[in-house]
Amino acid sequence: MGDEEVQALVVDNGSGMCKAGFAGDDAPRAVFPSIVGRPRHVSVMAGMGQKDAYVGDEAQSKRGILTLKYPIEHGIVNNWDDMEKIWHHTFYNELRVAPEEHPVLLTEAPMNPKANREKMTQIMFETFNTPAMYVGIQAVLSLYASGRTTGIVMDSGDGVSHTVPIYEGFSLPHAILRLDLAGRDLTDYLMKILTERGYAFTTTAEREIVRDIKEKLCYVAEDFNEEMQKAASSSELEKSYELPDGQVITVGNERFRCPEALFQPSFLGMECNGIHETTYNSIMKCDVDIRKDLYGNIVLSGGTSMYPGINTRLEKEMIQLAPPTMKIKVIAPPERKYSVWIGGSILASLSTFQNMWITKEEYDESGPAIVHRKCF
């Protein structure tokens, strides 16, 4: 690793979107959906050059004829063949690099099964022949990106949400809490409540339309009951959305009922705590001396933290849970959708990080389990 010219690749494989680019850049070069699509129908026209699988944006644009599968669910890879396709697409089509020439920094959710990162390591070294690799914890990278060394990160993506308290650069594993409630569950919930309005969305392709409605129109209410009354008494909260076939649908209280499930998971029939209680419980698992620093540095990260109003609402809920004199501050960086990637880009370009890489030699010597010793 002596020559400085070799740029490391940073790949943040989210359950919903894959963000990839070069270490040292301030934003990912490629952002595409983590989707592999396979044709639902038999081709009738020869010579069309149809493929048996499409990845990312191409799958998204041909979704009308494909069955779309997400190989990553709740932050855990459930289909390694499809995952390999996504990585192949990332390296060769999106970044246009030879992976055997660049170290690769991957990311994963905390409290993932150990086998998951071992398999990631194995594929990087054996399939893509990378010279070196590293697996970073997503929330820790987000904190790097916000320029802090102490804080609690509430990271919520498409597949998994988690709260990770970090003090002076050390993550506190005993206090990390994971919530398998995230963007994809909200999309499914929105599909369900739109059905109650008489709009049926059922296929995997239609789910993508609902995801778009969610991203464009949903917001978090500061006071849910008040907002429900407001929605019932007037139509000022209603917005219209044009479907791809030109028909227009109207969305009303669904706009805030959908993300409300983050605070009231019982909406989804889930028994877990909302993101505010999870954040609070995570802080309470930490040493009493550092709680004040955590309450004052609650950092939001991930695509599901992008709803307008989520930071004011989280702050309001935290004030009700915390001791009365405690100063609560929720930080919502504007680039939080990509902050995991940005943190990875910062980390991989630090000179002090260069001896942290797992090299091909170390892998050949110790096998995939090396990842637990070198990445924590």
Swiss-Prot record:
Tell me its EC number(s), please. 3.6.4.-
- Highest taxon above the source species: Eukaryota
Q: Where in the cell is it found?
A: Cytoplasm, Cytoskeleton
Answer whether the UniProt record assigns the keyword NAD to this protein. no
Where this protein primarily resides, as one coarse class? cytoplasm
Q: Which InterPro entries match?
A: Actin, Actin/actin-like_CS, Actin_CS, ATPase_NBD
Question: Catalysed reaction per UniProt?
Answer: ATP + H2O = ADP + phosphate + H(+)
Ligand binding (ATP): S15, G16, K19, D158, G159, V160, K214, E215, G303
> PROSITE patterns, per this entry?
ACTINS_1, ACTINS_2, ACTINS_ACT_LIKE
Keyword list (alphabetical) reads: ATP-binding, Cytoplasm, Cytoskeleton, Hydrolase, Nucleotide-binding
Q: Name one GO biological process term.
A: phagocytosis
MF-aspect GO terms: ATP binding; hydrolase activity
Q: Name one GO cellular component term.
A: actin cytoskeleton
- UniProt-annotated stretches for the region DNAseI-binding D loop: 40-61
Q: Quote the function comment for this protein.
A: Actin is a highly conserved protein that polymerizes to produce filaments that form cross-linked networks in the cytoplasm of cells. Actin exists in both monomeric (G-actin) and polymeric (F-actin) forms, both forms playing key functions, such as cell motility and contraction. Has ATPase activity.
PANTHER family linked? ACTIN (PTHR11937)
* Family statement drawn from the similarity comment of this UniProt entry: Belongs to the actin family.
Name-wise, this protein is Actin
> Could you tell me which species this protein originates from?
Entamoeba histolytica (strain ATCC 30459 / HM-1:IMSS / ABRM)
